[in-house]
Amino acid sequence: MIRRILSVLFLIWVIGFLWFVVALPRPAAEAGATDAVIVPTGGAGRIARGLEVLDTGLADKMLVSGVDPEVKPGEFAAQFAVEPEQMECCVTLGFAAVDTRSNASETAKWVAQNEVRSLRLVTTDWHMRRAAGELARTLPDHVTVIRDAVPSQPQFGTLFLEYHKLLASRAAGLADL
């Protein structure tokens, strides 16, 4: 009996992992403009995509969450070729977050302070589900979130680890931790 239960649980885990790998989120298709774009640091192409969203007028403001506290705004602007005027008006560097859960908390505070009603979440495809899930738990219901995944070529180990982080995040959400 226990062997059957464990076999079923293992099968569910395998099917879930295969779904996770095969059905990675994609870039937002023809989504309209939002009040803001949110970019958690940590993956290649995220900040560039966020700046592209700003430059094309799909968002008015951008929060880059989880920036290393030692990074100065001028250094950020130089590295990503952001004009000083755009840094001043439109780009906020968030230094409080250290992980996906604290990215969501930092984002929720920034959203409230800036009266954001719609946002575009830009993160790597393999990270999108967990980042969006954490964000959904912290944002008010009236805030619309568009998921805009940055395509990547993740290694097996990255996918394996992220799948388990997603499971842990969902379990924590069920337990309301």
PLM regions and their residue ranges:
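A structural signal for short, hydrophobic/glycine-enriched beta-strand patches
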Residues: 22-160
